[in-house]
A protein has these predicted regions:
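Extended, compositionally biased non-globular segments
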Residues: 261-313
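C-terminal TM-helix exit segments that contain a strictly Trp-centered aromatic cap at the helix terminus
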Residues: 94-106, 236-243, 308-313
Length: 357
């Protein structure tokens, strides 16, 4: 695979960087003009960060999986996966606005030793600890991604891949609580980390098939993985809801009660339709799963549904105006990420190897 093949079109890269810079400038202007809206701005940035970071982490997991299992799908998706995974160090910078906004976004941040909270929660949920966990996880993810992209096939690369998958599952479980579940500090779900992992895989597969149409010989594998991710997402989401409903746990029910107010329920139903029900129906026929064109056409709907789901997770606590702010944040984070990942990184930092091996 040549380095040139990893480049996005130059015009697309410039447009992405321009959009990212413009979105960032608008958000910064809003912060200066409306300092009282810090919570809304932080929540919007978190939504954009979760969406694009999810694609990059999905690429890391797929590269690690392919290093262990092999297959045509990895070779076919390599030009899209490698720049996305190698871009993970960028998120050490993109996370900084969230770090600055931690104190306004999370209810536990102003008073980490509130008497109503358990000793364990007081020791775990605090600004230094949450910041350190986030930065360490991003640093390790970045190192793993650069190793997987740069190393040749062999036992050492497989060992890195195996250790990376174990670390990722632990890290995404912890950060899923830190960044999302702790928006309501009394809520926690042991399946949230796995659900996040499945969404990352789904988002990255959709992104890769849209960015670079899958060759016909690899399309059935990619379509099968997409269908498995859709089924996994449906199962984990429903089982979490069922356990909480059946257990009648008031502190956990509050999470769902808040997200059924205003139009939040409609938002999640639309997300469910786009990211789960529609793809499930479309991908059931094997002819569709094996069609590169069909997968590429389905991808935007999947990505849109995943983005709406991220908004449903984060936005209700901050209010309706988080949604337009989130749209700007998606443009800002995504523009900067895409422009740098598929321009600078794809051209300069990714070594030409066969199938990333």
């Amino acid at each position: 695979m040549s380095a040139e093949a990893l480049h996005a079109r130059p015009g697309r890269v410039r447009l992405a960087l321009l959009g990212g810079a413009g979105g960032t400038a608008l958000l910064l202007a809003a912060l200066l003009v409306l300092p009282q809206a810090r919570e809304i701005l932080a929540a919007g940035w978190l939504i954009g960060l979760l969406f694009w970071l999810g694609i990059a982490l999905g690429a890391l997991v797929l590269l690690a999986t392919h290093a262990l299992t092999g297959g045509q799908w990895g070779r076919a998706l390599w030009p899209a996966l490698a720049p996305a995974a190698a871009s993970l160090p960028l998120f050490l910078l993109l996370i900084l606005p969230l770090v600055v906004g931690l104190g306004t976004l999370y209810p536990w941040a102003p008073d980490p030793e509130h008497a109503a909270r358990s000793i364990v929660a007081q020791r775990y949920l605090n600004l230094p600890g949450a910041t350190l966990r986030g930065l360490v996880a991003l640093a390790v993810w970045s190192a793993l991604a650069l190793l997987l992209v740069g190393m040749r096939a062999g036992g050492l690369r497989q060992m890195v891949a195996a250790l990376g998958l174990v670390f990722h599952m632990v890290a995404i479980t912890l950060l899923g609580f830190d960044w999302v579940q702790s928006l309501e500090p009394h809520f926690h779900s042991t399946s949230f980390g796995m659900a996040s992992l499945v969404l990352q895989l789904m988002a990255c597969l959709a992104w890769a098939t849209r960015l670079r149409p899958t060759p016909s010989e690899a399309a059935p594998d990619v379509g099968g993985m997409l269908l498995a991710a859709v089924l996994g997402s449906l199962y984990l989401g429903f089982s979490q809801y069922l356990v909480i409903w059946y257990g009648n746990l008031p502190e956990k029910v509050e999470w769902y009660v808040l997200r059924q107010h205003w139009g939040w329920l409609s938002l999640e139903l639309l997300a469910l339709l786009l990211s789960s029900l529609l793809p499930l129906v479309v991908l059931l026929p094997s002819a569709v799963r094996g069609s590169p064109a069909a997968l590429a056409q389905l991808a935007p709907w999947l990505l849109g549904g995943i983005l709406l789901h991220q908004a449903w997770l984060v936005a209700p606590g901050a209010g309706f105006w988080t949604l337009p702010v989130a749209a700007l944040a998606v443009l800002a984070v995504g523009g900067l990420w895409f422009g740098l990942a598929y321009g600078l990184i794809a051209g300069r930092f990714i070594r030409a190897t066969e199938a990333g091996a």
